[in-house]
Every structure is written in C-alpha cells, then in structure tokens.
Amino acid sequence: MNILKRKTPQNIRFGEQKPKYYFHIRAFAVLLGVFFLLGVYFNWQSILEKMDDKPISAFALVGQNTFTTADDIKESLLKMGELKGFWGQDVAPIQEQIEALPWVKGAIVRKMWPNRLSIWVSEYQPVAFWNQNQFVTLDGIVFQLPSVRLTAKNLPYLGGPDYQSLKVIETWNQIYINLKSNNIMAKGINIDDRGAWQVQLDNDIVLKLGRGDWKSKLERFVTIYPQIDVPENKKIDYIDLRYTAGAAVGMVDR
C-alpha cells in the first residue's frame, strides 16, 4: 500500500514584518490628510467665494402677501450692497434685513442656482388701530404699517401703554359684545397709565369708566342712557360713570 504524505513547505514564513519606514510613510500620509482637511475646513468660505463668478442679482417673492411688495424686498436687499454668489452668500443676514420691516413677522430665504433668491414672508395681521398711528395683532403685538396698505375696514381704535396691549384687546372683546347685545355700538377703548378705562361709541360719545371693575358701570350706562334728555341744540359729549351711583353727562353744542 502506498501512502501519500503531504509535504510541508519549508520556505513559507508567516507574519512577515514590513520595513519600519513603511509605518513612517503611512503616519506622514495620514497627518498630511488631516492638515489638508483642516485647511479646507477653515478656508471653506473663501474657497466657495472664489468659485462664485455671478453675484446674486434676482429674487422671487413667493406666497400670498397682504402688505409686502417686491419693491419692499428690493429696497431691503439694496441696503446690503452687492451680494455674493450662490456659494459664498450667507442667507442669515438677508433674512434679518427682511425681518427688519416692521410688519414682517418672519422670513425664509433660500438660494436658487445660479444667482437667485426665493423669499417667503409671514406678516403681522392687524385687528385694531393702536394709539392712532400703529396697529396691534390679536395676541397683543404692536407694530407699524403704512395705513395706505391697510385692506381691512372699520378696525376698532384701541390705545394704552404697549405693555397693556393684550389686556386691552381682551377687554375690548368683552365690552364690544356687551354693548352690542344692547344695540349699542362701540368703536374703541383706551386705558391710561393709571389704569382708567374709556370707551368711545360709534356716535363719538365717550364713556368714562375709571379704574377697577367696569362691568357694573356698563350695566348702569345701559340703564340710564335711554333716559337722558338731550336739548335740540346739544349733543352728548361724555358720560362719566366713575361714581358709585348715577352718572355725570357732559354736553356740547351741535
């Protein structure tokens, strides 16, 4: 019987060591790569700017806007001087510039290749005039808006210190509903620095309610108002309800 024996090669060496300089070269290559990446990272903005050959020069105002026009956006952008290109221009300062418009609640700015901007704005919505030359939102934010752009008609006239704006709106809603339920229309209210309330009716009569609880005073007004005797050549200027009972009525010539 012939038995085949497998010969073990004697010339094969396992785990052959590589020259020491190989590790030095590898470490140097890794270090070189790290320095390259750091250089790119810290000079990324300048690299992108050099790649830009067309500064941003156009924009699109998207969405439905009640007060903001393309001219408003154009004027805001022109204040920033010449913009950079698609890669180099940061949109954050553009967004801040647009949000500086007093009636703009917020803005979203996106870059569009190769040299355009897409701009969307959110606007404050006025529910009333505030101190004659301003406006106020439902949640009490006071802002400015050119009155010629106002589309809503017959807004109420509210007034007071700005920090009281939300309280004034809440009180207005209550007073308006209260009087309307008695077929009396109001067009505005005001609170002064001392916390005293005044209500202006649509016929320009002023109700002086003073400080504190105004509900009982309104009830008294609703009761006595139809009983006031007004001479033919006179009209009611104000009704002072700052008393525990009754009221003082001021009249002027027609």
UniProtKB/Swiss-Prot annotation:
Cytoplasmic side: 1-27
Gene name per UniProt: ftsQ
Regions of this protein lying in the Periplasmic compartment: 49-254
Biological role: Essential cell division protein. May link together the upstream cell division proteins, which are predominantly cytoplasmic, with the downstream cell division proteins, which are predominantly periplasmic. May control correct divisome assembly.
Keyword Zinc-finger attached: no
GO biological process, one term: division septum assembly
Annotated POTRA domain residues: 54-124
Species this protein is from: Haemophilus influenzae (strain ATCC 51907 / DSM 11121 / KW20 / Rd)
GO cellular component: cell division site; FtsQBL complex; plasma membrane
Protein name: Cell division protein FtsQ
Entry membrane topology: Single-pass type II membrane protein
Protein family per UniProt: Belongs to the FtsQ/DivIB family. FtsQ subfamily.
Pfam families referenced in this protein's UniProt entry, alphabetically: FtsQ_DivIB_C, POTRA_1
Classification via Gene3D superfamilies: Cell division protein FtsQ/DivIB, membrane protein fhac
Transmembrane segments: 28-48
Transmembrane found in the keyword field: yes
Entry keyword set: Cell cycle, Cell division, Cell inner membrane, Cell membrane, Membrane, Transmembrane, Transmembrane helix
Compartments where located: Cell inner membrane
Subunit architecture: Part of a complex composed of FtsB, FtsL and FtsQ.
